[in-house]
Amino acid sequence: MRYLINLCYNGSKFYGYQVQKDKLTVEGEIEKCLSTIFNRNINTIASSRTDRYVHANNQYCYFDIDIKVDINGLKRSINSMINDYIYIKDISESDIDTRRDVINKEYIYKINMGEYNPIEVEYVNQYNKIISEDVLKEFISRISGEHNFRSFTSDKDNNNYVRNIMISYYIDGDILYLVFNSKGFLRYMIRNIVGLLLDINDGKKSISDIDMIFESKNRCSLLRCASGCGLYLNKIEFKR
């Protein structure tokens, strides 16, 4: 039987999602709980391996086991013992492959354009400057669509750097919400895109540099990788 877990977490307390030796990770905590409950080694497969400080409103992982599971009881058991910064929202029987069956992922990046807020420092990028909507709209139009994003990742071993992404935004008070949708993203890709936006707004780069950056296929053409604290894995859609 395969069981699909829907969870959320506060990423500021973990060294990312993926298991790392002697580090507190989301995956490590989930597998520790499952292995304790079933008294056997349980491995999980997740849709996204979020980086350190990155949060998730909706992450998915699955595990396979050869017994029938009381899913409501399992949810209660995990939530009663797991780290306080992780919450299991739902468990269901499913044949979904959380990596191969993904058709869209949505991430949100939050930027504070107002006064510095120490209470939100782990949850919103404290840029604390107004971002010109003219710059923002032009930037989004240049970055959205299908491109080779080799310059926007530190991953040197990927076989395909082409991604088709859609970016939108909205503003609520002082907070700018950048919304990214794509079937998949490269490592640090969103944070590097946001970093470029901030550098353009600061005058360190220009809109006209974007084409050159794409063409260079070199991470060194960028100056800044935005903090992980403002990034949220928001939604994942699967083919049915």
Predicted regions and their residues:
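Structured-RNA-binding interfaces characteristic of tRNA pseudouridine synthases
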Residues: 1-240
